Every structure is written in C-alpha cells, then in structure tokens.
Amino acid sequence: MEITSAEFVISNTDVKKCPTGVFPEYAFIGRSNVGKSSLINMLTARKGLAMTSATPGKTMLINHFLINQSWYLVDLPGYGYARRGQKGKDQIRTIIEDYILEREQMTNLFVLIDSRLEPQKIDLEFMEWLGENGIPFSIIFTKADKLKGGRLKMNINNYLRELSKEWEELPPYFISSSENRTGRTEILDYIENISKEVYKNK
C-alpha cells in the first residue's frame, strides 16, 4: 500500500465523539514508551503526524488520522505508566476499554510490544482480556534495530512460547523498526488486505 495522504482529524476522550461513517479503523496501542508515535510516523511517512515525547504516558486521547481518504489510523493512549496516579490510570483504562468494546468501526487492534524486553505481565493480561472479549488483534514487536545477532529472534520466540501457554492459535505478528522502516510494507499490506475484505462485504 502506498500512503498518498494522511491527515489528523480529531482527538477526544469520548468514543461517542469519534468520527461517524463506515471507514474501517486500525487502532494502535501499547505500554507507555513502546515507540507507538514513532511507528505511526514511520508507517505514514509523515515525520510529525503523531507527536513523539521523551515523557512516557503523554498520549491521553483517542487520536484519529484519516489515511488515503479510505481508512482511519487510531492512536490510543498508552497503558501501564507507573508514575500516573490511580485516578489517571482509571481514566485511561476507561477511555481504552470504551473504544475497544464499543467502536464498531474498529477492524483490527495492533498491540505494540517492545522486542527488547521479556514478556511483561501487563501486556499478557491485556491480550488475554482482548481474547476474552473477542477482539481481533495483531502484535507488532517494536525497536527491532536495538537488538544484535540472534537476540531479536530469541526474544520473539520466547514471547510466542509464553503466548502459546494460553492461546491455541497465535495472533498474527510483525517485526518493526521505526529507525530503518523494517516491517512497514508488511503491516501496510496487512491493513490493505483486511480493508479489501471489509469493503467487499459491505
């Protein structure tokens, strides 16, 4: 898929105020500081489309970007930022859960995982919750350029092994790097193929 246009549409905290219409939505979510904004900018080839920050947990809104006048890329708040107070954590959880459970246009949720880390309990529990609620999702392992030699493959295999303990069938997954654009073609082609099916069935 070639990205010919990408524009910011709206930010809000209320799923009921999200854009109307039938365009499929592909949402991106992950723990704070997983590299979500950098990935979005890399996928869209728009350096400043999603604002990056040195401060984890900065994204606290549902951000809609219209891509190619045919689908929405949705930047969801990050979860699990330790320095956010309990009230703030509860607010973010409500925003995330309301969007995921209520937004009919959401076609696929991309869960971002830092490939440098061992499987984190918060990520595993979140994906388990998605499975329990029948939410279609895929995994994107980020920051692949930060690992040398066979470490990347070993980390991902460890993660898949951990997921296999709870899942009979593993979700699709992608390996990405915002620095060298690894995974860009695969992720965009995946979105394009799903969108074709969506429009074919309308």
Curated annotation (Swiss-Prot):
Disulfide bonds: none
Function: Necessary for normal cell division and for the maintenance of normal septation.
Domain of life of the organism encoding this protein: Bacteria
Domain EngB-type G, chain residue ranges per copy: 22-197
Residues involved in GTP binding: 30-37, 57-61, 75-78, 142-145, 173-178
Record-stated family: Belongs to the TRAFAC class TrmE-Era-EngA-EngB-Septin-like GTPase superfamily. EngB GTPase family.
Gene Ontology BP terms: division septum assembly
Alphabetical UniProt keywords: Cell cycle, Cell division, GTP-binding, Magnesium, Metal-binding, Nucleotide-binding, Septation
UniProt cofactor(s): Mg(2+)
The organism of origin for this protein: Bacteroides thetaiotaomicron (strain ATCC 29148 / DSM 2079 / JCM 5827 / CCUG 10774 / NCTC 10582 / VPI-5482 / E50)
Gene name of the encoded protein: engB
Gene Ontology terms for molecular function: GTP binding; metal ion binding
Protein name per Swiss-Prot or TrEMBL: Probable GTP-binding protein EngB
Residues at which Mg(2+) binds: S37, T59
